[in-house]
Amino acid sequence: MAAPRKKTQRKKKDPNAPKRALSAYMFFANENRDIVRAENPGITFGQVGRILGEKWKALNEDEKAPYEAKAEADKKRYESEKELYIATKAQSE
């Protein structure tokens, strides 16, 4: 008989920590999810994701460019917020 597994405690996430940056695909998916649901009523969550993935793969570089730009801007936002968060966290300790 296998020994019972010990539950590991996850470190609680700080609610003041900055939100992670979204990828270009996530910007695309957020923008197109409702459209896919409207075109395919009654499909499951997994099927929505599969269709979005196929649509993303079908885009050429020019069509992906606006989403890549949004992702780059969001990455810069995250990096600056993270630096500020780390600095204020270090001061409070």
UniProtKB/Swiss-Prot annotation:
The keyword Cytoplasm is annotated on this UniProt entry: no
BP-aspect Gene Ontology terms: DNA repair
Location within or outside the cell: Nucleus; Chromosome
Molecular-function annotations in GO: DNA binding
Cellular component, GO annotation: chromosome; nucleus
InterPro entries, alphabetized: HMG_box_dom, HMG_box_dom_sf, HMGB
Keyword terms of this UniProt record: Chromosome, DNA damage, DNA repair, DNA-binding, Nucleus, Transcription, Transcription regulation
Oligomer status and interactors: Weakly associates with the stable SPT16-POB3 heterodimer to form the FACT complex.
Role summary: DNA-binding protein that induces severe bending of DNA. Required for DNA-binding by the FACT complex, a general chromatin factor that acts to reorganize nucleosomes. The FACT complex is involved in multiple processes that require DNA as a template such as mRNA elongation, DNA replication and DNA repair. Also augments the fidelity of transcription by RNA polymerase III independently of any role in the FACT complex.
Protein name: Non-histone chromosomal protein 6
